[in-house]
Amino acid sequence: MRHQWVANRRGQSNVSQMHYARQGQITEEMDYVAKRENLPADLIREEVARGRMIIPANVNHVNLEPMAIGIASKCKVNANIGASPNSSNIEEELDKLRLAVKYGADTVMDLSTGGGNLDEIRTAIINESSVPIGTVPIYQALESVHGNIENLTADDFLHIIDKHAQQGVDYQTIHAGILIEHLPLVRDRITGIVSRGGGILARWMLHHHKQNPLYTRFNDVIEIFKKHDVSFSLGDSLRPGCTHDASDDAQLAELKTLGQLTRRAWEHDVQVMVEGPGHVPMDQIEFNVRKQMEECSEAPFYVLGPLVTDIAPGYDHITSAIGAAMAGWYGTAMLCYVTPKEHLGLPDAEDVRNGLIAYKIAAHAADIARHRPGARDRDDQLSEARYNFDWNRQFELSLDPERAREYHDETLPADIYKTAEFCSMCGPKFCPMQTKVDADALTELEKFLAKDQVGSAR
């Protein structure tokens, strides 16, 4: 749908949405987002210009349906997919992509580290996807030197970053905030550095005793991004990997650097969102969101979870959705889903489904809590259908219609039960929703109560 839109921008040195927004121009992407969000187009332009909203939309991803990530828009959900050296292939990843989009992923990150030709996998995903695609280019940079971290150079990183930009990746996680002086701060952690990208750079800095090359060459990354309109997703290399490590000096030192990098990118009209933790106890979530807004000048916050406890392997889509709902309520713009396989293995299609639904619930709950216009409309419609025993309408309005119908069918599969005024929980005689309160009866009751109060007053 974007062929003509981007064709009109050919030859321009900066094609970022922020660049146009700061020139006072409402692009086709901004107008499209305004309709999707039911917000004024000029508000979208103002938020993008200010840096509080991004529209990740690489000019080379022409089949993209533009969307927004920011505090003024609905809370979004990202799904991670990706092949590994031990599992998965192109077709399996495309199936995961389709499933993720089906169940409401607003963006998808390809975190492939193996399983075939990474360029082919990425190209296939971009060509198939109508939602923005994000990547972590450091993974392919490491693969390009056959896993020998010490052999990586700054040019290796930039080559892969540029390749991803040319292929149409809409946003890239760039781990530029971890500095060599931050490394001693992880000494007292239980889980050290849990970011894969952060771990790679930490080992590189420890080996060479040199500063993070993504930090020293940050302006070169900016130049690549503004040519293709790639958004920064500034990686939190020192995010806490357990609740013990949350909000520590290492995490906050990197966050301060991420704020400085955000403003450097903005000087060149390049869009930025900032990644966040991780594992955070419930009582620290508000602090983390507020601190990010303060340090990063209100750039959109994109958090992984956070998990609020560490004792539930196999159920971390639940432990993290609790934290995600709270983070969304406090103002986080996008939530990165966690699947039941987190910390245990590579998720399959069913894990993707379960993780996504858990996070769509969290994001929707956050939108309701933030009183976004129209956020509760679907809830009210489903409640009306429930009260009227309109089972098919309930299924239709559910986040996962297939699962809702499946559970109802387990005990009452016949079509006749789709109009029944009960379910298998209460049966035909005990359902409280059968007690329909007649409006006329309520009016008569009010008259009686009014008379009774008068009599009591005497």
Curated annotation (Swiss-Prot):
Residues noted as binding Zn(2+) in the record, renumbered to the chain: 279, 343
GO molecular function: 4 iron, 4 sulfur cluster binding; carbon-carbon lyase activity; zinc ion binding
Co-factor binding comment: Binds 1 [4Fe-4S] cluster per subunit. The cluster is coordinated with 3 cysteines and an exchangeable S-adenosyl-L-methionine.
Example of a GO cellular component annotation carried by this entry: cytosol
Reactions catalysed according to its record: 5-amino-1-(5-phospho-beta-D-ribosyl)imidazole + S-adenosyl-L-methionine = 4-amino-2-methyl-5-(phosphooxymethyl)pyrimidine + CO + 5'-deoxyadenosine + formate + L-methionine + 3 H(+)
Cysteine disulfide partners in this protein: none
Binding-site list for substrate: 80, 109, 139, 175, 195-197, 236-239, 275, 302
Superkingdom as given in the UniProt entry: Bacteria
Record keywords, A-Z: 4Fe-4S, Iron, Iron-sulfur, Lyase, Metal-binding, S-adenosyl-L-methionine, Thiamine biosynthesis, Zinc
Residues binding [4Fe-4S] cluster, per UniProt: 423, 426, 431
The protein's annotated pathway: Cofactor biosynthesis; thiamine diphosphate biosynthesis
EC number: 4.1.99.17
One Pfam assignment: ThiC_Rad_SAM
A single BP term in Gene Ontology: thiamine biosynthetic process
Cofactors: [4Fe-4S] cluster
Function: Catalyzes the synthesis of the hydroxymethylpyrimidine phosphate (HMP-P) moiety of thiamine from aminoimidazole ribotide (AIR) in a radical S-adenosyl-L-methionine (SAM)-dependent reaction.
Family to which this protein belongs: Belongs to the ThiC family.
Protein name (database record): Phosphomethylpyrimidine synthase
Species of the source: Acaryochloris marina (strain MBIC 11017)
Higher taxonomy: Bacteria, Bacillati, Cyanobacteriota, Cyanophyceae, Acaryochloridales
